[in-house]
């Protein structure tokens, strides 16, 4: 018989850098998860994506065992990396902080495709372009 999921915990953790310190430790402790077991497994699974923030969904079962699924990095993080900036604009409609090319947007859309609810790459690109505009980035051809 399948185990019953008791709780879902969603976190965004830097790849390969999960530690028992806040915010990871308290979130997992409340759910009753073995914190060291999770951090070791997460760090091993994400070691190749160093420097990225990885969203993770942890399913906690009634017997306190757990499984987790890592997602693709947030579009905003990928856009900042592609544009080479630290953060987006505080007022995106007035101040533009960077430009990204349509090719970079397509590359990000292809990376994000498994996690987006887009039917094709064009609609995924439009989603990423919208994120870029809301961050104060200009999209050029």
Swiss-Prot record:
Belongs to the universal ribosomal protein uL11 family. The keyword Metal-binding does not apply. Forms part of the ribosomal stalk which helps the ribosome interact with GTP-bound translation factors. One of its GO terms (molecular function) is structural constituent of ribosome. The keyword Ribonucleoprotein applies. PANTHER family: 60S RIBOSOMAL PROTEIN L12, LARGE RIBOSOMAL SUBUNIT PROTEIN UL11M. It comes from Streptococcus sanguinis (strain SK36). Pfam families: Ribosomal_L11, Ribosomal_L11_N. The lineage of its organism: Bacteria, Bacillati, Bacillota, Bacilli, Lactobacillales. Part of the ribosomal stalk of the 50S ribosomal subunit. Interacts with L10 and the large rRNA to form the base of the stalk. L10 forms an elongated spine to which L12 dimers bind in a sequential fashion forming a multimeric L10(L12)X complex. GO terms for cellular component: cytosolic large ribosomal subunit. InterPro entries: Ribosomal_uL11, Ribosomal_uL11_bac-typ, Ribosomal_uL11_C, Ribosomal_uL11_C_sf, Ribosomal_uL11_CS, Ribosomal_uL11_N, Ribosomal_uL11_N_sf. One or more lysine residues are methylated. This is Large ribosomal subunit protein uL11. It comes from the Bacteria. One of its GO terms (biological process) is translation. Keywords: Methylation, Ribonucleoprotein, Ribosomal protein, RNA-binding, rRNA-binding. PROSITE patterns: RIBOSOMAL_L11.
